Every structure is written in C-alpha cells, then in structure tokens.
Amino acid sequence: MQIRRLALHQLRRFNAVELSPQPGLNLLTGDNGAGKTSILEALHLMAYGRSFRGRVRDGLVRQGQEALEIFVEWDEQRASHPPHRRKAGLRHSGQDWKGRLDGEDVAQLGNLCAALAVVTFEPGSHALVSGGGEPRRRFLDWGLFHVEPDFLSLWRRYSRALKQRNALLKQGGPSRMLDTWDHELAEAGEPLTSRRQHYLERLQQRTVALAAELAPQLGIQAMELSPGWRRHELPLADALLLARERDRQAGYTSVGPHRADWSVDFHNIPGRDALSRGQAKLTALACLLAQAEDYAEQRGEWPVIALDDLASELDRTHQARVLERLLGGPAQIFVTATETPAALQELTHIARFHVEHAQIVAVP
C-alpha cells in the first residue's frame, strides 16, 4: 500500500496543502506546532474514522471553517496482482460526514476505513498497554476487521444485540424478550471471541520475536486474552442468564466480549502497572509492528506505517533498531521529528519534507 497523494483542506493549521510522498521512508521535519502531526492525523482519520488526538469537533476543523476535507490517492500492491490505483475523500464537520471511495458515495464510515490501512505509533500509544481495556479491544478488532472479511458483520451483529439488551434492562423488559437477545448475543459473541483468541495467538508469536530484537530487556513472553466472562467454566449464554438479575439492577450487560481485555506477560516485570512509560511505549510499538506484519502476511501488502515524533518517544538505540527493521522491508513509512533523527542522518534514499507556516515543502 503506497500513498501517492494526500491533500488537506481546513484541517487544524492548514488551509489547503498537498503532499506527494515517495515509496519507502518519508521524513517530515519542522518546529513544534508547525503541523507535522496533523498530516499523520489526517491519514489516521481516513483509516480509523477518528483522530488519535481526540474528536473531530474538538479542534480538528480549522477555526472559523465549517468542515475539513481530506483526499488520499494510493496504490494497492497485493502479491501476484498489478498495482491498483484507489482514491478516497472525506468531508467532516465534527457532526456530519460525507465520504467517497473510488468515485462512489459511501454509506458507512467503516467502508471507507476498510480501504486504507494505517498503523500509527504516536505519543499516546502507550495507552495500548497501560490504559484501559477499550483501546486493546479496538486493537484486536481493527486487525480482524482488515484480515477477516466477515468479521465486521459479526461485530455489528453483536453490537446491535448488546444495544437492544441494554435498552431492555433499563426499561425493565420481560424475561422472554431478554431470552431472545441473550441468544443473539451468544450466537455472535462466541465466534467473535474465538476470532479474537486465534488472532491474539498469532500476534503473540510476532510480538515476542519483535520485542526480542527491538527491546530484549523487556522480556515479553506471552499475550493473554480475558474474554469478558468465565469462558473456561461456562458458555456465554449461561453467563448472561446467571448475570441477568445483577444486570437488571445495574441497567447494563456486565458480561460478554464487550468487557474483554488482553495483557502482555513479561519474564521479569509483574504486570502493566509496574511498567515505566518507556517500557509501555516499547511494548506498544512491538504490538503495533506485529499487527502490521500480520496484515502484510494475510493481505499480501503492507499497511502504511506512521511514526509521530519518534525521536522524543524512543531513545537513539531503539530508534535505530526500529528504523533498520522497517527500512529492510517494503512498507511506506512516515516519520515526524523536529530535526532529522540520528539514525537517518546518513541516509540519502529517503524523501524529506519540511513543514512551516502551514505549508509543506519538499527538501532536495
């Protein structure tokens, strides 16, 4: 997957700018606040439907403007297939959005996000390891969404049933109606959990190997799924029935895949609460790169890799290891920094851009 053109309109500091990145590594430098991160933010918004720095309506649209617009043109380069040029556009006001993909309107944002895959490492990525369960569930589901075509319909089926059951619990609905939605939750939730389990097992092998190469001092040894109920003791249908009275009192569903989580086990660190911020960042990066490698194996092409403010997130040794690993493969990479990272100073085969005064200038 190679981005050929990125155009931004009314996004944060930018009025209208355009970037024509190259295959391989693209380095964007500039002072703090110049807008480097906003470029990666635009890619992330197209790939995930949200920014990694908050909601669209919280400052992403340029002040005084009604909506932002993003246009991306890229080549799909799957194995044994010739490159295929694709185009996507998004207009977002913070409340409403309109998207187009390959010349056609899209009815659901998920359809737009399914087209462009971006794996992003940014200053908040440590939350993947040290934060709450929601980002970890999203991490699993994003990967499955891209490598298993029917996963989205399964996830939507579960989400709809959960919404209906929660509404009934709040309204004090009759047991016969709860029986119906318990059955639907179990029918979708059991296979959804099996997918998550198998995916995490696959990622575990890659994450352990990557961490041993990039940050051997971490001693990552395993990744373990907590499915959201005592799955080793009883099926989800029984867990929902047993929790029904408690759920009636609480007004929401307390067991199921929406309560799932996963953790990383270390040789010499007792758990995530004992991790330093630096250790959490390195662990998160290993997980993200493992996800990118798995995507590449399953789909036959690499996702775009975006590394925001790499020099301030990792020390020089770890920067060098990460960049050496990535530069040895075919991925298109975007790196932002206030100045050229030491690991890149001697390289000549990278594309360089400077961001200043809300403009992007290619550096010869």
From Swiss-Prot:
TM helices/strands, residue ranges: none
UniProt xrefs under SUPFAM superfamilies: P-loop containing nucleoside triphosphate hydrolases (SSF52540)
UniProt superkingdom: Bacteria
A single MF term (Gene Ontology): ATP binding
Alphabetized UniProt keyword annotations: ATP-binding, Cytoplasm, DNA damage, DNA repair, DNA replication, DNA-binding, Nucleotide-binding, SOS response
Keyword Nucleotide-binding assigned: yes
Keyword DNA repair: yes
PROSITE patterns, alphabetized: RECF_1, RECF_2
Family: Belongs to the RecF family.
Name of the molecule in the record: DNA replication and repair protein RecF
Organism: Stenotrophomonas maltophilia (strain R551-3)
Gene coding for it: recF
